[in-house]
From Swiss-Prot:
It comes from Cupriavidus metallidurans (strain ATCC 43123 / DSM 2839 / NBRC 102507 / CH34). One of its GO terms (cellular component) is plasma membrane. Its main location: membrane. The complex is composed of two ATP-binding proteins (PstB), two transmembrane proteins (PstC and PstA) and a solute-binding protein (PstS). PROSITE patterns: ABC_TRANSPORTER_1, ABC_TRANSPORTER_2, PSTB. This is Phosphate import ATP-binding protein PstB. The lineage of its organism: Bacteria, Pseudomonadati, Pseudomonadota, Betaproteobacteria, Burkholderiales. Disulfide bonds: none annotated. GO terms for molecular function: ATP binding; ATP hydrolysis activity; ATPase-coupled phosphate ion transmembrane transporter activity.
Length: 262
């Protein structure tokens, strides 16, 4: 099966360029010759059935696999012209540029304030007043400030599930990354909390490049500007979300979107 790759228009700047990317778990070939460009300050959604490789692809963007010696990536992932796969850049600095929010809310076992301040302290030396401002800024960006401002020194575990996920997003943007990766951020949330996260995603793209993995096709249609459909480790189709959902080029894409998949 060959992929239909529709690069972004020339008028849209690419933040991440993926070329001939292959990924392996030991001998298992999980990603097969992926080629795509992730547009800057847009929301790109990865959709596809379980096990298709969408989360694996997402995690190559901040080299999460580097923690596991049996995993390896080959090819090129360039951000602003630098190949992340061959770069000798410190991994922690890369992850300051490319933040990530996981499927299950993962607040640190500390106060709401320190959840936000923790990552900032790793990369910046701020005065107390500057840190206070940064914490308020991040929580405000994540639409959590009004709910959390009176309990900043209480545990993040005391927040609801939706609030915890917004706390994780606030923690991710507090270090002012350039890219924000969201791996199924709403799968464990109720519809109201999901709606809040989707509204937040729409606001974040004004300042960040956002890439979201989702099993929820309606969510992809609502939130994203571009959509990639993946199957069995291959990129089947990639393009503007409206075109992917209304008039896809590939029958495989149409079958998945219309529920005829399988």
């Amino acid at each position: 099966m060959t992929s239909t790759v529709i690069d972004i228009p020339d008028t849209v700047r690419a933040k991440i360029d993926v070329r001939n990317l292959n990924f392996y778990y030991n001998q298992f070939h999980a990603l097969k010759n992926i080629n795509m460009s992730i547009p800057d300050r847009k929301v790109t959604a990865f959709i596809g059935p379980s096990g298709c490789g969408k989360s694996t692809l997402l995690r190559t963007f901040n080299k999460m696999y580097a923690l596991y010696p049996e995993q390896r990536a080959e090819g090129e992932i360039s951000m602003d012209g630098e190949n992340l796969l061959t770069s000798k850049q410190d991994i922690s600095l890369l992850r300051a540029k490319v933040g990530m929010v996981f499927q299950k809310p993962t607040p640190f076992p500390m106060s709401i304030y320190d959840n936000i301040a923790f990552g900032v302290r790793l990369f910046e030396k701020l005065s107390r007043s500057e840190m206070d401002d940064r914490v308020e800024w991040a929580l405000s960006k994540a639409a959590l400030w009004n709910e959390a401002k009176d309990k900043l020194h209480q545990s993040g575990y005391g927040l609801s599930g939706g609030q915890q996920q917004r706390l994780c997003i606030a923690r991710g943007i507090a270090i002012r990354p350039e890219v924000l990766l969201l791996d199924e951020p709403c799968s464990a949330l109720d519809p109201i909390s999901t709606g809040r996260i989707e509204e937040l995603i729409a606001e974040l793209k004004d300042e960040y490049t956002v890439v979201i993995v989702t099993h929820n096709m309606q969510q992809a249609a609502r939130c994203s500007d571009y959509t990639a459909y993946m199957y069995l480790g291959e990129l089947i189709e990639f393009g503007e979300t409206e075109k992917i959902f209304i008039k896809p080029h590939r029958k495989e894409t149409e079958d998945y979107i219309t529920g005829r998949f399988g």
